Each structure stands twice: as structure tokens, then as C-alpha cells.
């Protein structure tokens, strides 16, 4: 053994987050990958991939990147600028206790937060069961037949309820009535949604101002935003007499004590499950809900989990009735909903599973008792409570003392709600302590102790709940934390998420969600801030939002951003409204034509329809590019009424089109604006800026490019960036600037997940973000090169390159071997992979996006699996495998297959351990291939009875 003669310092940087943590391939691996593709350097590959005309001139620079520790210290310093007071503001946002077992094993568990929307049901059985629990919970509490698997927030759910009411109502009226006791943000968003569609909104007292003949529907708040509790049974009956639809916005915790909307006759119930264990988080994310009568289930927006069977007849879950949705029906869809709030819906469902009906009822009773005690103290001080009966919210007339009392309460560490100029409101919740009540009494001039008052109740006797809820055994069998932990673990083990393997979904950007980025979302300085606190209590949030806005402007070339949209589809909608408002301000409100290529995301035409625009479809040429002849012809044909075009860049076919600047110029020439969908921004950051190539507005999917996890189908964020001339038309909000145009319940959308994107930017720096883009392009081109010969890559640039994703053609296998794209996708499950995006944008193909976070080893494992699948298809072609009884047709294979009677013409080894599959750590699909047709024909969208669990297995 030799003895070193001197100590030599290494140049290895162990805390280089971009290159040592986030980016998968090492420098030596990149060199090997480049050789396979045929390039000597990464920069030469990038030069060959991006047209010179779209390259940005200056590098992305904003200071040195931070280490994980430095970034966390910066986040902590920023978080400490927020003041965490006790907020009794209410208005749809309430203090809640997240059970630690749920925080630790779901919210902070990558097995749950890194999963994708469960389009592949076989590898999503765990979260599908959790979502079915959620739907069952909502159906039980609302007294309605079918509930969806979550919506974005209560205000957007109300707007969706209005839109659904208009679709299904027999009334031909074009007005919608809104209870003045709805939350202000709900009223604002309903107005935003109604105006482009030509519907008028009537706001008033439903008992004096509602004439059912004049409306296609009405929405009532239950309990009201100021605490009133009314029985709407009579009003709902009157609405039904005229063919109108009744929507009730209901607090699910209150429904454990109060008569359900279904028992009143409501057609639709909407609301938010935030107070079921999900922190307020300065406005989100939270899971809203919608439940409807059975007759209207096919008109309901959003994801719907149903019960089906697999190939063995065993019970299996899947997304049902997908033909309602934007990815299939486009502008004719029930909604533009894409991202929902799955992670938060799972948390809320587990809150109900953990507490059970007795626990939920006890929590509700305790909340109500606190409100009664608060009222008694204020009454003893001589104040009058506006409501005789209430659940958790009271409103007090204080006259000219309003400002003094509000300031005194803040000095006591409590935020109360300003109601008009002479009233104060307060909403009690699960976290309200005796000290809080005593502090509020002091702010009102009293010096009472809680023991001075006797508990009581002030719920309306005629509206007390008598019906049962949460009767299914799942809500009774997991009270002990040991059992709860094991139940959550069992469900997560059924799913395939990023913590197990790469998820190469094209156009979805399933990249690393680093632990250091995730940590701050649980800090109380971020999670416990009410969205409507005074600005000086959220200075940390504002500082972070301002800095992130500045960074996103630098990345995109835009001049302003709105963080309000809480999904990519909402970003599209907000961007199109911004364009619409710009035209109206210029006296050109007649401009309503939106040009959209056939290859666009389904959300594009759905969003355009919601924004009151008419969609004109543009052809796509054989090479995947926009057909310029058709584009020119349509732009000229509709020039007088052209509002905008919507394009995705790089294209949805995975190529940087060289005509993008010409497209932008052509639209501007005819008076329109350019909406560039930011879904594929992961191929542009640091290399090209939408604002430089002629785009006027884009949304960015922070849950793609900027590392917010997909959460199994949400949360997401879709902030929009605009050029300067559109900035004044960005969404407003009643609680901030008072301007119209709100598109989300909270002014900054799902603000509590913004620390993820901000810390990603801080740790990567401009240079790291640029390198990430380059490696994303490298990884996609490497896969395309590795699969060459086995599969055709459908679309390439003139230089033979793809962008950050590639489309491989599996259609020839149908004719040669009877192998469909479904067969390939299900066989990948046996290999331990989530399938790439199937049949979009081209039917019968797979779109692969590996992202920059995947190592060469993982890319090689995926390629080995895909090549092995091609060889299995070849064996069928050559007659060496049976055409109908083979590993592809029978995939995925389960443990039940392995241990059961085996009479197949291939071995168990071939079935269960194909190339790419791990042996020791193999992922086993919990079910065989799910029967989609059975699930839609025999629709069951709530937990099946226990007996059926056994029946399905027979």
C-alpha cells in the first residue's frame, strides 16, 4: 500500500444541488450518451435541436446557486417574516389539526405525493381506493348520490356548479341567482365565469329576491358566510317547479350535525374539505368537492373514481366516465378540469377514516360549543349576536368600535373578520383554545374566564341531522394509529410512483421533487397563514412571491405574472380572459375567434369555450408541424374577429417548430394575441423565452417545470405571465385589489406550495436551470436513439432531433402481431414502469418524456424493457408465441398468477420477470388488467358493501 506524500484537495462539489442531486446523469454518463446519439458535446446537441431564431441572447443569471442548507436557511428567514396569529376570519378557511400520522405518512411521503393522475388503474389502486373513500364521505355527508374525486377550491367548484346547472336545467333562462350570504370570493368567481358565457348573475336574499322563473339555477350557502343557517327546502321546491337547478355550498363539518343538502332536495352540493385536516396555507391547496343526484352524473365535471373488475373478476378501481372530460371531448367537455386536488382529497378522506363518524361529530360539537360560549361572553358585554342559531360563525354589531376592537384583537394575537363598516365576524374551529376565547373577550372589553359560562347549543332544532353517515366499515376500522399507519402503507404499496421508478409521461414532466424543496410546506409559518390576513402578517409570503415572479419573468421574457391560477387549465382560462379583457378595453370585444391546432392539449379548446371564444381548428401536417397554409388561410378568413391563437412550444409532437415566429407575427398582423401553452417549458428554460419569440401570454405548470409534485392528480399551479400591454388585465381579487376577474378562491392560488418552486430556483440558479433543460433534451434524444430500429420515432426536426420528449409508433404492431398500445403499456407494468403517455397526440402511439432527473441506469432499464417488448411482439409475428395467449395480452401479471395454476404457453419467469424488472424489489401489480367497459356500464362510485369484496373474488 502506497503512502501519500502530500494532501491534495478535490474539486468535487458535494453540495452542488443541480449536478449532484437534481440532474440524473453524471458528466461521464452524458459523454457516453452523446456518443450513442452522435454528438461530441452537449452544446452541439442543443445547437442542433433548437432553431437559432428562437435562442435567447443572454444567459439566465441571478446569483450563485444555494446549497440545500443555505436554501432552507433562506426559506426559514423568509418564513419568519410571516406572523402566525390565531385567525378566526373564517370565510371558507378554518383552523384544523392535521393528524400527525396523516402528515407523516401521506403529506410528507413521496409514495403519495410523487404519483401521477391514475389514468393507469392497475398501478393506482391505492390512491383510487383513498379517493373512493373521499367520494363516499362526500356522498354520505351531502345526502347525494354521486361525488367526484375533488375540484380545485370552493369558489371554482361553485362556478362549475353553475355551469353544470345551465347544462342540465330544463329552464331556458340565462340568469343565475347567488345567495348574498355566499363567501365573497365565491360570488366574485361566479361573476367571472358567467360573464363571457352571456349569463347574468343576480345576487340577493333568496327569501325576498329570488324569482325561480327568471333563473336556470341558484346557489345557497349552508351555513352562510356570516353564520346564518336557513332551511332551503321550500326554495328548492320552487326552483324545481320552473325547471331550475338548486346548488348548495355546504360546510362538510357542519353536515355532521345538520340536515344534508340532499334531504332538502338539492340537485348539486359543492364545498371544500379543507377543515378535514388540511392546513389553510395562505389559501391552498385544498380539495373542493361536488356531489350530484344520480340523474346528473354524466354532466358532472372532474375525475370520478368507480368500481370495476379485473381480468380475473376481482374488484378493481378506475377513473370512470372519462368521455366527459377535456382530454377526450375538448371544447365539448363538461369542464377544462385536468389537475384536481388528489393529495389533499386523500388527506381529507384519511381524516374521516381516522376519526370516523363519532370523531367527526364530536369535533363538530366541540366547535359549535366554542361558538356558543363566545356568543355568551359577548352578549354579557351587551353586544347583540346577529344570528339566533349558528354552527361555528357569529356576527356582532359593534358600530363605530369596529376598528378599535379589530386592532385590540390583533394585539391579543387574534384576527377577526371585518364585516361591512359596523360589524365583526368570527369563526371558531377545531384549533380554537380557551385562551383564544378569553383573548377575544378582552378585545371587546371583557375580562371573563371560560369557566364563567355554561356550555349549550344554538343549532336550529328543525335542521338537526337524523340520518346516518360514514356507515361503511372503512370508517370504523382504523382508529388505532398502528392500524391507520398500516392501512396507509398497504394502499401506497399498491401504487407506482416516482419513489419506485421513472414515470416517462410525455407532456407531464415527472421530474425530481427534492426533499429539501418539500420540507418548508409543513412549517407553520407557511401552513398556518389565513389567506385574508392583513398584508403585514404575510410579508414573508409577499417577499417570496415577488422574488419568484421576478425569476419567472427572467425565464420567460414576460413583464408581469399572476400566481392566482391553481392549475394549468385554470392558467389557460385566466390567460384567455386576460386577452378577452384586453380586446374589450380596446373597443374590440367582438374578437372571439381562437385558432387551435388539432394537436393541442384538450384543455386548450375547453378553456377557450369557457372564455366565450369560438374554436377554429388548424390542421397539422404529416411531419407534426402546424400546417402553415391552413394557418394563414384561417388567420386571414377570421381576421376581423380574431382574438388569439393557442400554440404549444415545443410542439405537442416533441419538436421545436421553426415557423413559430412566423405564426406569432401572422396573428399580430391580424389583430390577435398569441397564447403559448407552457406545458413544455422544461425544454426551454435558459435556452429560449416565449416573450422573445412573439408570445403575449403563457401559463407555467409549476407542478411540471418547477418541481411541485403531481400528488397523484393534484395539487398544481398554473401562474400566467404576460407582456406589459396585458398586465392591467390580469385577474383581480375582492380581498386584495378589489378588481374583478378572480379565477381562484384565494388571491395567490395554492400559495403554500410556492416554496417548492422558489427553493428549486434558489438551489439551481440560472446556470443550473439551463443545464437541466439541456439534460432533459439529452435524455429524450438518448431514448430515441436507443429505441431506433425497434420503433419508429414519429416526429423529428430537420436535423433529426427531438426536444424533451419523443413519440414512438406502436401502431405497426397491431397489424403484424395484434399487439395494441394498451398491451405495451400493461406489459411495462410487469417491468416496473408507468407507461408513457398513450395515444396522445397521436392515437396508438407512446409519448416519452424522461426529464433531466433520471439517471442513465434508469433510462437503460426502460430501454431494455421497451426492446424486450418489441422482441415479444416479434415472437408473435414469427409464430413463436401465441397471438392471444402471450405475456403482452395477459399483462400485467400478478402474484395470484404466479402462485396459481399455470397453463400458459410461456413460463412464469417470462411473465413476471421480463428485462427491466427487478427481482428482489419487483413491483407487483395488485390487480390484473382492469375492465373499463364493465366499470362504465355498471357504475359504482362509492365504497362497495363489504359483501361485494368477497363476491368479486368468486
Swiss-Prot record:
BP-aspect Gene Ontology terms: glycine decarboxylation via glycine cleavage system
Required cofactor(s): pyridoxal 5'-phosphate
One cellular-component annotation, GO: glycine cleavage complex
Keyword NADP in record: no
Catalytic activity: N(6)-[(R)-lipoyl]-L-lysyl-[glycine-cleavage complex H protein] + glycine + H(+) = N(6)-[(R)-S(8)-aminomethyldihydrolipoyl]-L-lysyl-[glycine-cleavage complex H protein] + CO2
N6-(pyridoxal phosphate)lysine PTM positions: 704
UniProt EC number: 1.4.4.2
Highest taxon, organism lineage: Bacteria
Top EC class for this record: oxidoreductase
The entry's keywords: Oxidoreductase, Pyridoxal phosphate
Any GO molecular function: glycine binding
Protein task: The glycine cleavage system catalyzes the degradation of glycine. The P protein binds the alpha-amino group of glycine through its pyridoxal phosphate cofactor; CO(2) is released and the remaining methylamine moiety is then transferred to the lipoamide cofactor of the H protein.
Record-stated family: Belongs to the GcvP family.
PANTHER family cross-referenced by the UniProt entry: GLYCINE DEHYDROGENASE (DECARBOXYLATING), MITOCHONDRIAL, GLYCINE DEHYDROGENASE, DECARBOXYLATING
Assembly and oligomerization: The glycine cleavage system is composed of four proteins: P, T, L and H.
Name by which UniProt lists this protein: Glycine dehydrogenase (decarboxylating)
Natural source organism: Rhizobium rhizogenes (strain K84 / ATCC BAA-868) (Agrobacterium radiobacter)
Gene coding for it: gcvP
Amino acid at each position: 500500500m502506497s503512502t501519500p506524500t502530500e494532501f491534495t484537495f478535490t474539486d468535487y462539489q458535494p453540495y452542488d444541488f443541480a449536478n449532484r442531486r437534481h440532474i440524473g446523469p453524471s458528466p461521464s454518463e452524458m459523454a457516453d450518451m452523446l456518443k450513442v446519439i452522435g454528438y461530441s458535446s452537449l452544446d452541439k446537441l442543443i445547437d442542433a435541436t433548437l432553431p437559432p431564431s428562437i435562442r435567447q441572447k443572454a444567459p439566465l443569471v441571478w446569483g450563485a446557486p444555494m446549497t440545500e442548507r443555505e436554501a432552507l436557511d433562506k426559506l426559514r428567514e423568509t418564513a419568519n417574516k410571516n406572523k402566525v396569529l390565531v385567525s378566526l376570519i373564517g370565510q371558507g378557511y378554518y383552523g384544523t389539526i392535521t393528524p400527525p400520522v396523516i402528515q407523516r405518512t401521506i403529506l410528507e411521503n413521496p409514495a403519495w405525493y410523487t404519483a401521477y393522475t391514475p389514468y393507469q388503474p392497475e398501478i393506482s389502486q391505492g390512491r383510487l381506493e383513498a379517493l373512493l373513500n373521499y367520494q363516499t364521505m362526500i356522498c354520505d355527508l351531502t345526502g347525494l348520490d354521486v361525488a367526484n374525486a375533488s375540484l380545485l377550491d370552493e369558489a371554482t367548484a361553485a362556478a362549475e356548479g353553475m355551469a353544470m346547472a345551465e347544462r342540465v336545467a330544463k329552464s331556458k333562462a340565462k340568469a343565475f341567482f347567488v345567495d348574498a350570504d355566499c363567501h365573497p370570493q365565491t360570488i366574485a368567481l361566479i361573476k367571472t365565469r358567467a360573464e363571457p358565457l352571456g349569463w347574468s348573475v343576480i345576487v340577493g336574499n333568496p327569501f325576498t329576491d329570488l324569482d325561480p322563473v327568471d333563473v336556470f339555477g341558484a346557489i345557497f350557502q349552508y351555513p352562510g358566510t356570516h353564520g346564518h343557517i336557513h332551511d332551503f327546502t321550500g326554495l328548492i321546491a320552487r326552483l324545481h317547479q320552473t325547471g331550475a337547478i338548486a346548488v348548495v355550498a355546504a360546510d362538510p363539518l357542519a353536515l355532521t350535525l345538520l340536515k344534508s343538502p340532499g334531504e332538502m332536495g338539492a340537485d348539486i352540493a359543492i364545498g371544500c374539505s379543507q377543515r378535514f385536516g388540511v392546513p389553510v396555507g395562505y389559501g391552498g391547496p385544498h380539495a373542493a368537492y361536488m356531489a350530484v343526484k344520480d340523474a346528473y352524473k354524466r354532466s358532472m365535471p372532474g375525475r370520478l373514481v368507480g368500481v370495476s373488475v379485473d381480468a380475473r373478476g376481482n374488484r378493481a378501481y378506475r377513473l370512470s366516465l372519462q368521455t366527459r372530460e377535456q382530454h377526450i371531448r375538448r371544447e365539448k367537455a363538461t369542464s377544462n378540469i385536468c389537475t384536481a386536488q388528489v393529495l389533499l382529497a386523500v388527506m381529507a378522506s384519511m381524516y374521516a377514516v381516522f376519526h370516523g363518524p363519532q370523531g367527526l361529530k364530536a369535533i363538530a360539537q366541540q366547535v359549535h360549543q366554542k361558538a356558543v360560549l363566545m356568543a355568551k361572553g359577548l352578549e354579557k358585554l351587551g353586544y347583540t349576536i346577529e344570528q339566533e342559531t349558528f354552527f361555528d360563525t357569529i356576527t356582532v354589531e359593534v358600530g363605530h368600535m369596529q376598528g378599535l376592537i379589530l386592532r385590540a384583537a390583533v394585539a391579543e394575537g387574534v384576527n377577526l373578520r371585518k364585516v361591512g363598516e359596523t360589524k365583526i365576524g368570527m369563526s371558531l374551529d377545531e384549533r380554537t383554545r380557551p385562551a383564544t376565547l378569553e383573548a377575544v373577550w378582552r378585545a371587546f372589553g371583557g375580562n371573563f374566564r371560560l369557566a364563567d359560562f355554561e356550555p349549550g347549543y344554538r343549532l336550529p332544532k328543525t335542521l338537526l341531522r337524523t340520518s346516518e353517515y360514514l356507515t361503511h366499515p372503512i370508517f370504523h376500522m382504523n382508529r388505532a394509529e398502528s392500524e391507520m399507519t398500516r392501512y396507509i402503507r398497504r394502499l401506497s404499496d399498491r401504487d407506482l410512483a416516482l419513489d419506485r421508478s421513472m414515470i416517462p409521461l410525455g407532456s407531464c414532466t415527472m421530474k425530481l421533487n427534492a426533499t429539501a424543496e418539500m420540507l418548508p410546506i409543513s412549517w407553520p409559518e407557511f401552513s398556518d397563514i389565513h389567506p385574508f390576513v392583513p398584508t403585514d402578517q404575510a410579508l414573508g409570503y409577499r417577499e417570496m412571491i415577488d422574488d419568484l415572479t421576478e425569476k419567472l419573468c427572467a425565464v420567460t421574457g414576460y413583464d408581469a405574472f399572476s400566481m392566482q391560477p391553481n392549475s394549468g387549465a385554470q392558467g389557460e382560462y385566466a390567460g384567455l380572459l386576460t386577452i378577452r379583457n384586453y380586446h374589450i378595453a380596446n373597443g374590440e370585444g367582438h374578437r372571439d375567434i381562437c385558432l387551435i391546432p388539432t394537436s393541442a392539449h384538450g384543455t386548450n379548446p375547453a378553456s377557450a369555450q369557457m372564455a366565450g371564444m369560438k374554436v377554429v381548428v388548424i390542421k397539422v401536417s404529416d411531419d407534426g408541424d402546424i400546417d402553415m397554409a391552413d394557418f394563414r388561410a384561417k388567420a386571414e378568413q377570421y381576421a376581423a374577429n380574431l382574438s388569439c391563437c393557442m400554440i404549444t412550444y415545443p410542439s405537442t409532437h416533441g419538436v421545436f417548430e421553426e415557423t413559430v415566429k412566423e405564426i406569432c407575427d401572422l396573428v399580430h398582423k391580424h389583430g390577435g394575441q398569441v397564447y403559448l401553452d407552457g406545458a413544455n417549458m422544461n425544454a426551454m428554460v435558459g435556452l429560449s423565452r416565449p416573450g422573445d419569440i412573439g408570445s403575449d401570454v403563457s401559463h407555467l405548470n409549476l407542478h411540471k417545470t418547477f418541481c411541485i409534485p403531481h400528488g397523484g392528480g393534484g395539487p398544481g399551479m398554473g401562474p400566467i405571465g404576460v407582456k406589459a400591454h396585458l398586465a392591467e388585465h390580469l385577474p383581480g381579487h375582492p380581498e386584495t385589489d378589489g378588481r374583478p376577474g378572480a379565477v381562484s378562491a384565494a388571491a395567490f392560488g395554492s400559495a403554500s406550495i410556492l416554496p417548492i418552486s422558489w427553493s428549486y430556483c434558489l438551489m439551481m440558479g440560472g446556470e443550473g436551470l439551463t443545464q437541466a433543460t439541456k439534460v432533459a433534451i439529452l435524455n429524450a434524444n438518448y431514448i430515441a436513439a436507443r429505441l431506433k430500429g425497434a420503433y419508429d420515432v414519429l416526429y423529428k426536426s430537420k436535423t433529426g432531433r427531438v426536444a424533451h420528449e419523443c413519440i414512438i409508433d406502436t401502431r405497426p404492431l397491431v397489424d403484424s402481431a395484434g399487439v395494441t398500445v394498451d398491451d405495451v403499456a400493461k406489459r411495462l407494468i410487469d417491468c416496473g414502469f408507468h407507461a408513457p403517455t398513450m395515444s396522445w397526440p397521436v392515437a396508438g402511439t407512446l409519448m416519452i418524456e424522461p426529464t433531466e432527473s433520471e439517471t442513465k441506469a434508469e433510462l437503460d432499464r426502460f430501454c431494455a424493457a421497451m426492446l424486450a417488448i418489441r422482441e415479444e411482439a416479434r415472437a408473435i409475428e414469427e409464430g413463436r408465441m401465441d397471438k392471444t395467449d402471450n405475456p403482452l395480452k395477459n399483462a400485467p401479471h400478478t402474484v395470484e398468477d404466479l402462485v396459481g395454476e399455470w397453463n400458459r404457453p410461456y413460463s412464469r419467469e417470462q411473465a413476471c420477470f421480463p428485462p427491466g424488472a427487478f427481482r428482489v424489489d419487483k413491483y407487483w401489480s395488485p390487480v390484473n388488467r382492469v375492465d373499463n367497459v364493465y366499470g362504465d356500464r355498471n357504475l359504482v362510485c362509492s365504497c362497495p358493501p363489504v359483501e361485494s369484496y368477497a363476491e368479486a373474488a368468486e
